[in-house]
Amino acid sequence: MIVKEINPHFEDYVFNWEQTYQFLVGGYGSSKSYHTALKIVLKLLKEKRTALVIREVFDTHRDSTFALFQEVIEELGLTKAVASLSSPLQLRFHNGSRIMFKGMDNPAKLKSVHNISLIWIEECSEVKYEGFKELIGRLRHPELKLHMICTTNPVGTSNWTYRHFFRDERKKRFVLDDSELYEKRTIVKGDTYYHHSTANDNLFLPESYVKQLDGLKEYDPDLYRIARKGRFGVNGIRVLPQFEVLPHDQVKKCIAAISKPIFRTGMDFGFEESYNAVVRLAVDPEKKYLYIYWEYYQNKMTDDRTAEELREFIETQELIKADSAEPKSIQYFRQQGFRMVGARKFPGSRLQYTKKVKRFKKIFCSDRCENVIYELETLTYAKDKNGALIEDEFTIDPHTLSAIWYALDDYEVADMKETAHKRMRPNRERRRS
C-alpha cells in the first residue's frame, strides 16, 4: 500500500464528488492541476469510467496533462496497472477505465467520443464559451453520475469563465461574488463546487519560486494579480480610467447644473454580430466632464426597423452624427425625416477620436446605459505580438465608443499641453501707465 501525501487545502477537493461541476481557480504553482489529475486517477481506479481531458490546443496535452497523469501514476506505483498509449493519446486502466485527451482545435474528433461521464477542462479560460457548452452536451452516460471539472488561472472579468461562474453584468446574472471565494477558499453554490488556491497552498513548492512570484508586484501588477494572488480583475491597461457609473437621476441633476451644456448624439451602424449603437451625451466645457445619459443598442436590425424604434429623433430633430462609412444608411434615415450627417473619418481618426475622449477629466455614465458600461468600464488596449500596446485597438469592438467618437466629431477637448502653452504665452498688450 502506498501512502500519498497531498496538500491539506486540496484534501476535501480530491475526495469530493457530490457536485456535478467543480470550478478551480488559482495562481501559478498552486497545485490545482496536479491534484485534479490525482483526483481523476483515484476515481477511475474505483469505478469503470471514461474520462475526457480537454485543452484548447491538442498538441499541448503531451507535455502538460498527459505528463502530469504519468507522474501521478508512477508515484502511486500503478505503472503496471495503467497503460500509456501515444497513438491515440490515451491512458487505459486494468479495470477498463480510460482517459482520453482531445483538443478544441479539432472539434470533429469529439463527435466520436461516447459514454463520457467525467470531463476535465484544463486552462478552461482558453476554451471558447461555445466549446464549453458543447462539452456539456458531450457529458452523458446512461448510469453513472456526471462530473465536469474546470481548472484555470484567473484572467480578465470579461472572460466567459467569470461571467458564467460568477457574474454577468450585461445579462444581469449573478451566481457568486468572487471576493467571497477568495475569503472562504471553498464554496458550494447549487450544483457547483468552487475552490481557490495560491502558491501558499502548495507545501512542496520551493521558496525561491514563491519569491519569484512576489517579485512580479514591482513590474507587472496584472500578472501579479493572476499568478500570485489568483484573482480575477481588469486585464491590461484601461482605455478610460476616468469612467464612472452614477445613478441616472444624479447624472440628470449634474447635467441640469451645467451653465452652458453642449449636447451631442452619435450613432454606430451594425447588423448581424455588430450592433447599432446610439448615445446621447452632454459636455461640461468648463470642467471638461462628459456625461452619457441615454443609449440605444440593438443588432440584427434592418434600417427600417431601427428607424421605427428611433422615431423620437424625428420629432426632436436632434442632429445625429453617424458612421460615414455607411452613406446608404445615412441617406435612408434622412429620407425618413432624421437630421443625420456622417462624421469625419480620416487616416488615424480612430486614434485621434480615442485621445479626444481620454482628454475629459471625468466621464460619468448613467446606470441605465448598461451596454455603455459593459463595453467601456473595463475596456483595455490590445497588444501586438511583442506585448506593446496598440493605441487604436482594443480587446473588444466597443460600438458605444464609436458612437461617442462620432457624437464628438465637431467638438474639441483642449488637452493639458495646449492649456499649459497658452498660459505660458507672454501678454503682448502694452501696460497702461
From Swiss-Prot:
Pfam families to which the protein is assigned, alphabetical: Terminase_3, Terminase_3C
Xref: InterPro entries: P-loop_NTPase, Phage_terminase_lsu, Terminase_L_C, Terminase_L_N, Viral_DNA_packaging_terminase
Keyword terms, alphabetized: Viral genome packaging, Viral release from host cell
Gene3D superfamilies reported in the protein's UniProt record: 3.30.420.280, P-loop containing nucleotide triphosphate hydrolases
UniProt entry tagged with the keyword Cytoplasm: no
Residues making up the signal peptide according to the UniProt record: none
Lineage: superkingdom: Bacteria
Keyword Ribosomal protein attached: no
Stated family: To B.subtilis YqaT and phage SPP1 terminase large subunit.
Subunit structure, as described in the record: Dimer of a small and a large subunit.
Task of the protein: Functions as a terminase.
Matches recorded under NCBIfam families: phage_term_2 (TIGR01547)
UniProt-recorded name of the protein: PBSX phage terminase large subunit
Source lineage: Bacteria, Bacillati, Bacillota, Bacilli, Bacillales
